[in-house]
């Protein structure tokens, strides 16, 4: 194998610094990702989580840090990516140790569901990090922690989510939540990611479409400003009010995933041009939005609307 270049050596150093893995593991993941450091680190995190979290957490939950290090060191040769050396391993264990006790504090049923924070625990936890249940930031936290359903957090999602943003205490988590609250209305990519994650989060178990009432509740959250969203209504057109009125006239039908996602795109297009200069009959919009455009034009008395 040819020697590493100066740039590759620097990447190995960066990988080791971020993950606390050894040089051999760093080089392996970097080669597999064609020396893309970010992809290599993501691959490392995704691989180590399912393979080793159980082995790491069990001793952390029942023993002190020193004893946990001794127990986990047995698995160092068996688990790819575990930090080498007792000092690095101790740092790793301390990090997970803190999360273990944080999770234990908020679990609803430690015996029945030891790896899950349920609704009651989630409410207490969100209160501690100063997040209200009826604000967009609450949904952003759910997206960050990959919550499987509303008001539920898993151990793996909790750990991986907060570790990805380097938050390991209630104070840091509260600060990150406050930062999200500021960024969501002004960062379209972040807003869209949270908005889209809300669809599966709010689905009733066993259903593929969102109940109309739930969809309207979430639109009122995302498309108004009081709880951290973006105002869709303007001084000239009450877009959100008309959208809900239009759907009510059509029978309050359930909302599918495509329509849910495209409504947010449509909202931003109406901000660019309320006169629909961007709209085309040949566009790839859902039929419901095509019909809404015609409905709005007729309601506003736009020229030519009656002939469409």
UniProtKB/Swiss-Prot annotation:
Q: Which GO terms describe its molecular function?
A: cullin family protein binding; ubiquitin conjugating enzyme binding; ubiquitin-like protein binding
- What GO biological process terms does the UniProt entry carry, in alphabetical order? protein neddylation
Membrane-spanning residues: none
Q: Which PROSITE patterns match?
A: DCUN1
- One short Pfam name that applies is Cullin_binding
All residue ranges annotated as the DCUN1 domain in the record:
94-297
Give start and end of each UBA-like domain.
Answer: 8-45
Signal peptide span per the entry?
none
Q: Which GO terms describe its cellular component?
A: ubiquitin ligase complex
Q: What does this protein do?
A: May contribute to neddylation of cullin components of SCF-type E3 ubiquitin ligase complexes. Neddylation of cullins play an essential role in the regulation of SCF-type complexes activity.
This protein is called what?
A: Defective in cullin neddylation protein 1
Q: Could you tell me the gene encoding this protein?
A: dcn1
């Amino acid at each position: 194998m040819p020697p590493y270049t100066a740039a590759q050596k620097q990447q190995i150093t960066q990988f080791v610094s971020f993950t606390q893995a050894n040089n051999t593991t760093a080089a392996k993941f970097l080669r597999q990702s064609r020396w893309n450091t970010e992809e290599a680190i993501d691959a490392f995190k995704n691989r180590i989580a399912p393979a080793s979290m159980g082995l790491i957490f069990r001793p952390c939950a029942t023993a002190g840090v020193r004893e946990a290090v001794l127990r986990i060191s047995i698995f160092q040769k068996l688990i790819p990516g575990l930090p080498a050396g007792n000092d690095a391993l101790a740092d790793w264990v301390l990090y997970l140790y803190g999360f273990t006790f944080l999770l234990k504090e908020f679990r609803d049923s430690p015996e029945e569901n030891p790896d899950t924070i349920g609704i009651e625990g989630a409410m207490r936890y969100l209160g501690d990090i100063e997040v209200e249940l009826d604000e967009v930031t609450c949904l952003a936290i759910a997206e960050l922690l990959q919550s499987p359903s509303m008001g539920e957090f898993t151990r793996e999602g909790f750990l991986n989510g907060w570790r990805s943003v380097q938050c390991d205490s209630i104070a840091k988590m509260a600060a990150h939540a406050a930062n999200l609250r500021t960024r969501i209305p002004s960062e379209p990519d972040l807003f869209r990611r949270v908005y889209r994650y809300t669809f599966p989060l709010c689905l009733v178990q066993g259903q593929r479409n969102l109940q109309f009432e739930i969809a309207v509740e979430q639109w009122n959250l995302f498309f108004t400003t009081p709880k951290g969203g973006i105002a869709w209504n303007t001084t000239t057109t009450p877009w959100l009010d008309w959208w809900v009125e239009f759907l009510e006239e059509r029978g309050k039908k359930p909302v599918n995933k495509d329509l849910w996602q495209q409504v947010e795109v449509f909202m931003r297009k109406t901000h660019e041009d309320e006169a629909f200069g961007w709209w085309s009959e040949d566009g790839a919009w859902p039929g419901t939005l095509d019909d809404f455009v015609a409905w709005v034009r007729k309601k506003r008395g736009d020229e030519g609307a009656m002939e469409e």
